[in-house]
């Protein structure tokens, strides 16, 4: 039962120095420090349950997201949780329509990252109070309640409330069987952990060999900085995994449109399933042009991790600009906005393969994609969820991978709660880890 009035919202800048090991490095982001604006909301309920939410960043700039969270905090404080979730669409609209901070969005950029962090904390709190993981909270909701969580503004030309309700009602058929399947087998995953751009060939080979031993069959390699380097690294991986296993490529927005087509034409011999983020995430027509050129070569287009909002996804789908849609649990406006994108993807019959490279993203997005299979898509064809083997040890309820699949979380909440010791050690700039690193830089 939903209970309590929110009386406190705190937000901290938490950073992990992943750049020291080249983890997360790609053609555009060469030295990321995986980071998060970490939000905790507390209520006056006697149970003492806290809601925890994050949005993912790469180090510098996290302090700006923290400021944006604080600018939105008044929308949450002194609100009864039952009033928020009882009119979740209205609350989402309130957060995203605040006239002054909206000007530095709207529904994109720093202010939308902050919105995601706040809403992720609300979903975590709600699910904890209900005693369910978020995926189960969603699966158990009746279709009308799910639809009531979604803001359909700007997407009714593609998805109306009636469309969404029809999709969800159809998804009720076979739902119990699919839930049992997920609990037994998990949701298929792919690994990005082997082939960050900053890794040496020896590291790449070592990690790839270990991944094969661990049962991984789907691999992603970062490309885009140097063509000959890409050819060499892709050859190493393809030789190791063989042609029977799946290979994807990710350029992280490095190329112009003609360059993307030319570059990928030269990498086509390695038989990638997709090229991810070949150009600017805002260039819908550019993605459509690249798609038209590469699909005949057997290469699909995947994008979405830096798509600002549901409107960009709507246009990508309308323009036939992608073959694989990549939601992000912290870029979009939390569960609410992701629901609208999952439903649009279903309407266009485009598989959803979430982005999960980053601190806490695996923990969050597993809930969304498991719900998608059970209640929306009812398909695993050409579907998989990214997995990155970094920083899970800092979470109270870390993701569980078995047989290269995400096993559905059983603990209540959104799996967003971090260990307090980890937060204190990695808080920027006053945590123990950063005091040492910053002192060393000064010397």
Curated annotation (Swiss-Prot):
The keyword Lyase applies. It holds the Pfam family MR_MLE_N. Mg(2+) binds at residues 250, 276, 305. Gene3D superfamilies: Enolase-like C-terminal domain, Enolase-like, N-terminal domain. It is an enzyme of class 4 (lyase). Keywords: Isomerase, Lyase, Magnesium, Metal-binding, Mitochondrion, Phosphoprotein, Ubl conjugation. The keyword Membrane does not apply. GO terms for molecular function: isomerase activity; L-fuconate dehydratase activity; magnesium ion binding. Its cofactor is Mg(2+). GO terms for biological process: amino acid catabolic process; carbohydrate catabolic process. It is found in: Mitochondrion. One of its GO terms (cellular component) is mitochondrion. It catalyses: L-fuconate = 2-dehydro-3-deoxy-L-fuconate + H2O. Could be sumoylated. SUPFAM superfamilies: Enolase C-terminal domain-like, Enolase N-terminal domain-like. This is Mitochondrial enolase superfamily member 1. It comes from Pongo abelii (Sumatran orangutan). The gene is ENOSF1.
């Amino acid at each position: 039962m939903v209970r309590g009035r929110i009386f406190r919202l705190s937000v901290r800048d938490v950073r992990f120095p992943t750049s020291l090991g080249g983890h997360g490095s790609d053609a555009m982001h060469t030295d990321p420090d995986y980071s998060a604006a970490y939000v905790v909301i507390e209520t006056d309920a006697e149970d003492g349950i806290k809601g925890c939410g994050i949005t993912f960043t790469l180090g510098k700039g996290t302090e700006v997201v923290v400021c944006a969270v604080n600018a939105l905090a008044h929308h949450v404080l002194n609100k009864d949780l039952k009033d928020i979730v009882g009119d979740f669409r209205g609350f989402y609209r309130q957060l995203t329509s605040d006239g002054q901070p909206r000007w530095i969005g709207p529904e994109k950029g720093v202010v939308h990252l902050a919105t995601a962090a706040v809403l992720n904390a609300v979903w975590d709190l709600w699910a904890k109070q209900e005693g369910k993981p978020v995926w189960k909270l969603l699966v158990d909701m009746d279709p009308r309640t799910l639809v009531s969580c979604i803001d359909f503004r700007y997407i009714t030309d593609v998805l109306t409330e009636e469309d969404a309700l029809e999709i969800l009602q159809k998804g009720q058929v076979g739902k119990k069987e699919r839930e049992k399947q997920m609990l037994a087998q998990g949701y298929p995953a792919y690994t990005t952990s082997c082939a960050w751009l900053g890794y040496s060939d020896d590291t790449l080979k070592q990690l790839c060999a270990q991944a094969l031993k661990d049962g991984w069959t789907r691999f992603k390699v970062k490309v885009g900085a140097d063509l000959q380097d890409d050819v060499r690294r892709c050859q190493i991986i393809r030789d190791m995994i063989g042609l029977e296993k799946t290979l994807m490529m990710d350029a992280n927005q490095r190329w112009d449109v003609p360059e993307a087509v030319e570059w990928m034409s030269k990498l086509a011999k390695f038989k990638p399933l997709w090229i991810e983020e070949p150009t600017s995430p805002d260039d819908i027509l550019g993605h459509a042009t690249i798609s038209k050129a590469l699909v005949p070569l057997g290469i699909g287009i995947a994008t979405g991790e830096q798509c600002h909002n549901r409107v960009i996804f709507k246009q990508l789908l309308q323009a036939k600009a992608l073959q694989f849609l990549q939601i992000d649990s912290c870029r979009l406006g939390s569960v609410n906005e992701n629901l609208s994108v999952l439903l649009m993807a279903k309407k266009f019959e485009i598989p959803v393969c979430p982005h999960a490279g980053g601190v806490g993203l695996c923990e969050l997005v597993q809930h969304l994609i498991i719900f998608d299979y059970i209640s929306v898509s009812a398909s695993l064809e050409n579907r998989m969820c990214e997995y990155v083997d970094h920083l899970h040890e800092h979470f109270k309820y870390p993701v569980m991978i078995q047989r290269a699949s995400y096993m559905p979380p059983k603990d209540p909440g959104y799996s967003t709660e971090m260990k307090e010791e980890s937060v204190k050690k990695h808080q920027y700039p006053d945590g123990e880890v950063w005091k040492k690193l910053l002192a060393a830089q000064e010397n």
